[in-house]
Amino acid sequence: MDLHETARYLLQYRTERHRICAITTYKGRITAVGLNSYVKTHPEQKRLAVRVGHAEREFLHAEISALLKAKKADAIHVFRLGKDGTWRNAKPCAICELAIKERY
């Protein structure tokens, strides 16, 4: 199963407004998967949100969820699935960019 197939499988039944999946890899193998959550948060999410001036964005982002789970990672891939089942543009927000820069 490639990364797109994995992301589609994980996102297909989600009902949130933004269906976003982040997958970390190390030497081409998946090391962690993160999905965005509007009901959960994490202290690291809050810390990063405050640092970039968006304290209100404390819900757990997919990228941060994946980075917290990954023991090793040399790449992170972000996917967004539209309500119609097509892939949409996805890129990390300022909060997640900071998390990625701190990690790498």
PLM regions: where:
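Zinc-dependent deaminase catalytic domain
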Residues: 1-104
